[in-house]
């Protein structure tokens, strides 16, 4: 595997309903086996369910959930002198939203509701109100970074 070539960032088109690239990326993360229509149906139905059940703007709820779950710090493993250190590093915006969507989807799929639409709707609403499993995952990540603050001088090469 060559280390010289950096993969080019793909241009992702915004979704049809809300004209949002962030929501389009979220739909792509939900998608399994190339079934984008199914993924879109799940996400849009979950947003409609949020609007009906809680009478709030579903797109604003989605944005709040993603913003609340997005981490600012994470730990990366750095090898120095035969020892591996967990070094806290800043998370750039694109990776932060990627982690947030992954955590929300994983938390939703582990919920007890029967359909993924209900699971996703409840997890998004809870995340927008700073509750839920995805928020807990973000807090755990920040705690890990805080606990390893002493190793921050071993910053990885990409930070220099």
Swiss-Prot record:
Any one Pfam family match given in the protein's UniProt record, by short name: Ribosomal_S7
Key word rRNA-binding present: yes
UniProt xrefs under InterPro entries: Ribosomal_uS7, Ribosomal_uS7_bac/org-type, Ribosomal_uS7_CS, Ribosomal_uS7_dom, Ribosomal_uS7_dom_sf
Single Gene Ontology MF annotation: tRNA binding
One of the record's GO cellular component terms: small ribosomal subunit
Domain of life: Bacteria
GO biological process: translation
Keywords assigned by UniProt, alphabetized: Ribonucleoprotein, Ribosomal protein, RNA-binding, rRNA-binding, tRNA-binding
CDD domains registered for this protein in UniProt: uS7_Bacteria
Subunit structure: Part of the 30S ribosomal subunit. Contacts proteins S9 and S11.
Family, similarity comment: Belongs to the universal ribosomal protein uS7 family.
NCBIfam families, per database record: rpsG_bact
Function: One of the primary rRNA binding proteins, it binds directly to 16S rRNA where it nucleates assembly of the head domain of the 30S subunit. Is located at the subunit interface close to the decoding center, probably blocks exit of the E-site tRNA.
Protein name: Small ribosomal subunit protein uS7
Organism: Rickettsia prowazekii (strain Madrid E)
Organism ancestry: Bacteria, Pseudomonadati, Pseudomonadota, Alphaproteobacteria, Rickettsiales
Gene that this sequence comes from: rpsG
């Amino acid at each position: 595997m060559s280390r010289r070539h950096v993969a080019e960032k793909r241009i992702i088109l915004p979704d049809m309903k809300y004209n949002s690239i962030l929501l389009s990326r979220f739909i792509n993360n939900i998608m399994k086996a190339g079934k984008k229509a199914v993924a879109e149906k799940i996400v849009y139905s979950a947003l409609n369910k949020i609007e009906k059940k809680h009478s709030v703007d579903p797109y604003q709820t989605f944005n709040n959930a993603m913003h609340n779950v997005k981490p600012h710090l994470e730990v990366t493993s750095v090898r120095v002198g035969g020892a591996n250190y967990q070094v806290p590093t800043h998370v750039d915006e694109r990776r932060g939203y990627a982690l947030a969507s992954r955590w929300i989807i994983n938390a939703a799929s582990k919920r007890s509701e029967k359909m993924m639409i209900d699971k996703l709707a409840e997890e998004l609403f809870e995340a927008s109100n700073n509750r839920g499993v995805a928020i807990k995952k973000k807090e755990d990540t920040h705690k890990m970074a805080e606990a390893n603050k002493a190793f921050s001088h071993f910053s990885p090469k990409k930070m220099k």
